[in-house]
Design a protein with these regions (language model features):
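Terminal beta-strand-rich extracellular "head" domains
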Residues: 23-32, 43-147
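Glycine-rich, low-complexity segments
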Residues: 1-28
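Short, solvent-exposed loop/turn segments enriched in Ser/Thr/Gly
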Residues: 36-39
């Protein structure tokens, strides 16, 4: 499959999508720690060494305590490194959220290797930080593409 971005701008380019993999979980993860805790995960076996991975994490809910900010990042457990983005979500008067986290990961990946990505979470203070919901489905999608 090819996707062509043809807006006429200099940053527009074509991209080739190689594969899409998806995982689902009905688990609830407690990330009420000031160090990162792994939560939902998804694995992909790459088809090309020229690939990037677009990783989309969609927890069905996020519950935070009133005295904390939640920090969320992507961990590549195969290589033991993290992506560049760290999302910070403030309590801001409501502890119930429904975020979508999108990470673009393209750090030295090798065709034929299987990479496992985890959404990790932590808190600024040790307070409630629950990702997911028992019985409801959260998902993680990885799109392998060449740009």
């Amino acid at each position: 499959m090819s996707i062509n971005f043809v807006g006429g701008d200099a940053q527009d380019s074509s991209m080739r999508m190689l594969q899409v993999v998806r995982s689902h979980t009905t688990s609830e993860f407690n990330a009420n720690s000031t160090t990162y805790v792994s939560t939902m995960s998804c694995a992909i076996t790459l088809r090309s060494s020229s690939s990037n991975c677009l990783v989309i994490c969609q927890p069905v809910r996020l519950v935070m305590g009133g005295s904390t900010d939640g920090m969320y990042r992507l961990l590549n457990t195969t290589q033991g490194n993290t992506g560049m983005n760290v999302f910070r979500i403030a309590y801001a008067g409501s502890g119930y959220k429904n975020p979508t986290f999108i990470f673009n990961y393209g750090t030295a990946l090798t065709a034929g290797n299987t990479y496992t990505f985890h959404l990790q979470g932590k808190t600024s203070t040790v307070d409630t930080n629950i990702i997911g919901d028992h019985g409801s489905t959260s998902s993680m999608t990885i799109i392998e593409y060449i740009s």
